A protein has these predicted regions:
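Catalytic helix-loop patch of NAD(P)-dependent Rossmann-fold dehydrogenases
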Residues: 119-166, 187
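Amphipathic terminal alpha-helices
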Residues: 294-302, 306-328
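NAD(P)H-binding glycine-rich loop region in Rossmannoid oxidoreductase-like domains
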Residues: 49-88, 96-99, 116
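Conserved C-terminal active-site "lid" loop/helix of NAD(P)H-dependent oxidoreductases
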Residues: 202, 261-270, 274-304
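Mid/C-terminal beta-alpha module of Rossmann-like enzyme folds, strongest
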Residues: 211, 215-278, 312, 316-319
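Substrate-positioning beta->alpha
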Residues: 143-144, 171-177, 190-213, 220-221
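N-terminal Rossmann NAD(P)H-binding glycine-rich loop of SDR-like oxidoreductase domains
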Residues: 1-23
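Conserved Rossmann-fold NAD(P)-dependent oxidoreductase catalytic core, especially the SDR/UDP-sugar
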Residues: 92-136
Length: 328
């Protein structure tokens, strides 16, 4: 079976290519970074497609499945950039699937759609506000999901995966920011770090996406994916820095004040059309200050998903790699 992976040169994409090829799939890796595409070709014997999502709709490639992992995933930026990447890009992928008579499209979305100014536990896939306008990323990912549902209704079998808090070797977002903060100003600790969160080893997300390709469950469904190990934020930090071999440094801050400050900052940035990410955003405050855990029962039943790497194993693997690189 032949799978096209969009965004293959990104963090998740590399692990996804490895997961598919190690399980016997023929893979075409799509992306714009030709150097990384060449590395994927050399390391995993994949086909490569060097193009942007703007151009993909016109491509004619005989593939059985598409996993759409490409997205503009950040908390700040220009509306048109988010729209072009996450909405228009998704429509272009849908058009590619129709042109090439693809059997199934697996779309990578985000559990950021669940974010609210309150603790939320055991969230099921349907428990989200489809009018969530916290940031452009969430708005455009919701719009992309609407396109996926429409395509499914029109005859293209589609599945949506919402993976939470990906981390692993090669991560440039979650853990590197925590490590940097710990070594400089200290890690912001809101609500004493008692908020319970789900984070996910990227290897487990790649597994879930392969299972979504293989599953014979009804199309049109959405699945949460996590490690299935809800944990207090402070406990995750303590385990991480024990493995790294550093003392954890905290900066205790009040949630309410930070939310107010972040709202003001965002307002100023919007007023003056500043597109560089603010030092603090509402999304960051809500993520660090409130509990959010996801229910993955549906993925376990329909996809037969069971995480293959525990949270502790993933943290140790990341910490060992960080220490090895810093010694060199």
């Amino acid at each position: 079976m032949h799978v096209l992976v969009t965004g293959a040169t990104g963090f998740l994409g590399k692990y996804l290519v490895e997961e598919l090829t190690s399980n016997g799939y023929e893979v075409t890796a799509q992306g714009r970074n030709e150097k990384r595409l060449n590395e994927l070709r050399d390391n995993y014997a994949v086909h490569t497609l060097a193009c942007s999502l703007d151009d993909i709709a016109s491509k004619e490639i005989s593939v059985d499945y598409v996993i759409h992992a490409a997205a503009l995933s950040t908390v700040w930026g220009k509306w048109e950039d988010f729209y072009n990447s996450n909405v228009t890009g998704t429509q272009n992928v849908i058009d590619f699937c129709r042109r090439n008579k693809v059997k199934k499209l697996v779309h990578v979305s985000t559990p950021s759609v669940y974010t609210e100014k309150k603790d939320r536990y055991d969230i099921k896939e349907e428990q989200f506000n489809d009018k969530n306008k916290l940031n452009f990323y969430i708005r455009t990912k919701l719009m992309a999901e609407e396109l996926i549902h429409k395509a499914n209704e029109e005859g293209l079998p589609c599945v949506i995966i919402r993976p939470r808090g990906l981390f692993g070797i090669g991560d440039t977002s979650i853990i590197p920011r925590l490590v940097k903060a710990n070594r400089t100003i200290g890690i912001p600790l809101l609500n004493e770090g008692r908020n319970v969160v789900d984070i996910t080893c990227v290897e487990n997300v790649a597994l879930a996406l392969r299972l979504a390709v293989e599953s014979e469950c009804d199309a049109g469904k959405t699945y949460n994916i996590t490690n299935g190990e809800p944990t207090e934020f402070k406990k995750i930090l303590e385990e991480l820095f024990v493995q790294i071999g550093e003392e954890t440094r905290y900066k205790k801050l009040p949630v309410g004040l930070l939310y107010f400050v972040s709202s003001v900052l965002e307002g100023v940035y919007k007023l003056f059309h500043i597109y560089k990410e603010p030092s603090l955003t509402r999304y960051t405050v809500l993520t660090l200050g409130y509990s959010q855990t996801l229910n993955i029962a549906k993925a376990r039943v329909d996809l037969h998903y069971e995480p293959k790497m525990t949270l502790s194993e993933g943290i140790k693997k990341y910490a060992d790699d960080l220490k090895a690189n810093e010694r060199n």
